[in-house]
Every structure is written in structure tokens, then in C-alpha cells.
A protein has these predicted regions:
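Glycine/serine-rich phosphate-binding loop and adjoining beta1-alpha1 elements at the start
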Residues: 1-29, 45
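A Rossmann-like FAD-binding core segment of flavoenzymes
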Residues: 65-168, 231, 238
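Short hydrophobic core segments
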Residues: 4-14, 48-49, 69, 131-141, ...
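FAD-site-proximal beta/loop scaffold in flavoenzymes
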Residues: 24-43, 130-203
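Rossmann-like NAD(P)H-binding beta-loop-alpha module
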Residues: 29, 40-82, 189
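A short alpha-helix-loop-beta-strand transition element characteristic
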Residues: 16-18, 157-160, 207-217, 241-246
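A conserved FAD-binding loop/helix module that cradles the flavin
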Residues: 83-89, 93, 174, 180-238, ...
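Flexible, glycine-rich terminal cap/loop adjacent to redox cofactors
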Residues: 205, 221-232, 237-333
Length: 333
């Protein structure tokens, strides 16, 4: 085994798909997200086990391609960190796309079987249900790719999912060793991981650096796309903050009609008294791009009036901000 030494070390090895020895993963009949591009054919039916971000992304992609998808997860709620109304809309659209959701259901068995139309996979649920599907995507999370690092030699120990614990400066328990990205856990996004790497390097070498983690935008590439930044209705309610909501639907906007997205929506949360913008949630085409307009206003402590007083190009989806702002202000009055 090779050894490496340095005054400062940053661990950024990412993650790998979580595997279970009891699951007969073969890369084709039962596969993980890492195997998708190697599939030999498009299945007619697919069961996705795990409704995390990756499981949802692939479930909606396959469903959009015409595959009959069943989604299983032992949790009754999906993506609990996302605004509930946005998730409700996503779930509605998934069902409209002929997807079957088995939430609150745990898998107790999975085995390849022979069928009259070829090989199949039989999945048993603890509730007694059985699902027979052409293929199964096993997506129950990711594990830190730390297995080959010999962390013990450096005085570090990962948790049960291979992740490394860090402080707010991204330092591990060993002060000159830092860790960033997916290997430290949520939110496990490429964008946030890059920012964590920048901050870790600055902290390691005493360079002043500012960042606002509470304003990190999250992009979830389901179909339709989701992006959020700032507070949600649930977090504001839990904190006892008086707030109001403004909404705009893509079907109300010329660009939404042009591109044929009649289901997208943009939602603003703002303080009911000061009108300060508190959060933005978007579902639909271009959500992860549109979110940055709201992110900029949030970063500068702006109010919902910014959108009312600003002219947006026509026809663009950005006009949703103005429509949503008018909707919210009208609710106040």
C-alpha cells in the first residue's frame, strides 16, 4: 500500500452506490444507478427500490421514456427537506405518468425468476404484496468511498455509511485533515461540494472566505425538475414566522405555453410584515437555473417588491417571479 504525507490533506473521494450482499446485483436484471448506461435494452417494466433523490430522478426518467415504473420506499414521505406542496405536485405528476408508488412499504425479499415472457424479478414486501417486474433498480443511498483509504492509519474512523465527520471549517478529528463533498454527507451535490472544497482550502491556508450555506440552492433533476433555496413553508411554520406565499404557474406565462409545460410552478415565501423574501421553490422546466434569481435577492436581504418593480424579458420563465410577487402582495391586501 502506498503512503502519502502532506501538511494539509483534503479528502474528496465522493461516494459509491450502497450495496447489500443479500441483493443479487448483476448489473442488468437487478442493477444500481452506476449500471444504467450499461443496460443492454430498455425494460418494459421497472421497479425502483428507494425514493431518495437518485431513485426519484431515475424513476421519472424511465417513466417519461414509457417504462411502467413502480417506486418502493419504506418512508411514507419523500424528500422531506423539500416544500410539501412542491412534492405533492411532483407525486401527482408521477402518477399521471402511470407510475405506481408503494410508500411506507419495506422490501423483504428479491429474487430473479423465470417468466413466460423471459426472466423477471420478484420482489416481496413485508405487507405481503408481491411485485413481478422485468428489471429492478436498487437505489438505497450511497456510501462514502473510503474503504481503501486506511483512515485508521491517520487517526480517523468513518461512520457506518463510510462518511467522515467534519466541523464547520470542514476539519476532521485530525486538524490538518479536511474532508468535503459527498463523503461528508448531505446535501451531496456537485455545486455544494465544489464550494466546500474552496472553503476547506481557504481555511487550511488562513485565507478569509465568506459563504452562506443556508442559501445553497438544491437542484433535483427529476422530470419535472425541482429547485429550492432558503426557507420552506414547513420550516417557517415551525419557527413561528408570519409569512405569506405568492405563486405563479407556468401555464400562466407565455414561455410556459410556448414550451408546453403546463404543470410547472414557482412559489415565493416572504415575511408578512416586512415583505422580506424568505424562500423560493420551483417545479418545472429550468427550475435549477431560475432559482438563482431568487437566491440573489435572498442573499441581499431583498423584499418581494423587487420582483414587482423589476422588468423581466418577455417571453421568459423568469416572468414567474413577477406574477408570483403580485399574487403574494394581493394576498396581503
Amino acid at each position: 500500500m502506498r503512503e502519502a504525507g502532506a501538511g494539509v490533506i483534503v479528502i474528496a473521494v465522493g461516494t459509491e452506490t450502497t450495496r447489500d450482499d443479500s441483493v443479487p446485483l448483476d448489473g442488468q436484471r437487478v442493477f444500481t444507478s452506476d449500471d444504467v448506461l450499461g443496460l443492454d435494452a430498455m425494460p418494459r417494466s421497472l421497479t425502483v427500490i428507494g425514493a431518495g433523490v437518485i431513485g426519484l430522478e431515475y424513476a421519472t426518467i424511465f417513466a417519461t421514456l414509457g417504462v411502467r415504473v413502480t417506486l418502493i420506499d419504506k418512508r411514507r414521505e419523500i424528500l422531506s427537506f423539500v416544500d410539501t406542496e412542491i412534492i405533492d405536485s411532483l407525486v401527482h405528476q408521477m402518477r399521471q405518468n402511470r407510475m405506481t408508488l408503494r410508500l411506507g412499504e419495506a422490501v423483504c425479499g428479491l429474487e430473479p425468476v423465470a417468466g413466460p415472457k423471459g426472466p423477471r424479478v420478484r420482489i416481496g414486501l413485508e405487507s405481503g404484496k408481491q411485485i413481478v417486474t422485468e428489471r429492478a433498480l436498487y437505489s438505497v443511498g450511497r456510501t462514502g468511498a473510503t474503504g481503501g483509504l486506511n483512515l485508521a492509519a491517520a487517526g480517523l474512523a468513518p461512520d457506518e455509511r463510510g462518511r467522515i465527520v467534519v466541523n464547520d471549517r470542514f476539519q476532521t478529528a485530525v486538524p490538518h485533515i479536511y474532508a468535503v463533498g459527498d463523503v461528508i454527507g448531505f446535501p451531496s451535490l456537485a455545486s455544494t461540494s465544489m464550494e466546500q472544497g474552496r472553503l476547506a482550502a481557504c481555511n487550511a491556508f488562513g485565507v478569509m472566505a465568506d459563504s452562506v450555506p443556508e442559501l445553497f440552492p438544491y437542484g433535483i433533476y427529476t422530470i419535472p425538475e425541482i429547485s429550492i433555496v432558503g426557507e420552506s413553508e414547513e420550516s417557517l411554520t415551525a419557527a413561528g414566522v408570519p409569512y405569506e406565499v405568492g405563486k405563479a404557474f407556468y401555464r400562466e406565462i407565455a414561455r410556459g405555453q410556448i414550451i408546453g409545460d403546463n404543470t410547472g410552478m414557482l412559489k415565493l415565501m416572504f415575511h408578512a410584515e416586512t415583505r422580506q423574501l424568505l424562500g423560493v421553490a420551483i417545479l418545472g422546466e429550468g427550475a435549477s437555473d431560475l432559482i438563482h434569481i431568487g437566491q440573489a435577492v435572498l442573499a441581499h436581504g431583498g423584499t418581494v417588491d423587487y420582483f414587482i418593480n423589476t422588468v423581466f424579458n418577455y417571453p421568459t420563465l423568469a416572468e414567474c417571479y413577477k406574477t408570483a410577487a403580485f399574487d403574494g402582495i394581493n394576498r396581503l391586501e
